[in-house]
Amino acid sequence: MKIWTALRNAAKGWVLLLRGDAGWREQFTRSAAGLATALAIFIFVVFLAVIIVAIGTDIPGLFAILAGMFALSLPLVSMALVLAGTRMALGVAGPTYDVLVPGTYALMGFIVVEGLLASLFGGPIVVVSWLALGYLLYRLARAATGWHTGISIGFAVLTVLLLVAMRQALYMLSSIAGSPS
């Protein structure tokens, strides 16, 4: 099955990337089709995460499912925005598929790990998943783009900060919208 092959290759690719092996690129389909596959799997993982959270409660409506999927998709949005901003600031036309495809698979793992940590241990321990995500994004930026250490660290830190800021803004907006006036 193509989905399982893509996930297995992504896991192999990330292991190779973290080891510093140059063969990590061959494990990912770094093209529009590869990005479409990664996004389809990402959407499925996000949908499953929303449904799993709702198992202990009532069946959510369509709007609640879509809102949950939107909130869980913020890591992907933040990575894409920071990548575009970094490329624009540097004035380079670097390899976007080299970052977006492996990054999408890493964010799938992040969503799963963050959800497990939040449900098992509570809020403050979730910071560990943010730190792990930052490290993965740093290593990805170094390997995929050849950016200097400082730029790669900046990319990773800005992506995680934007993710946290967007979630906080969404939380504040939802509490304002839900409060009686």
Explain the meaning of each model-derived region.
Residues A40-A49, E114-A118, L170-M172:
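Short, charged low-complexity intrinsically disordered segments located at boundaries
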Residues A32, A36, T57, G61, ...:
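Residue-level signal for alpha-helical context at structural boundaries
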Residues L83-L162, Q168:
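Hydrophobic alpha-helical transmembrane segments and adjacent short intramembrane/lumenal linkers
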Residues A67-G68, G122-P124, R167, P180:
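A short, structure-level motif marking secondary-structure boundaries and short turns
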Residues A165-S181:
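Juxtamembrane boundary at the C-terminal end of a transmembrane helix
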Residues I52-A54, F121, G178:
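Low-complexity, flexible helical/coil segments
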Residues K2-P95:
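Selected alpha-helical membrane-embedding segments in polytopic membrane proteins
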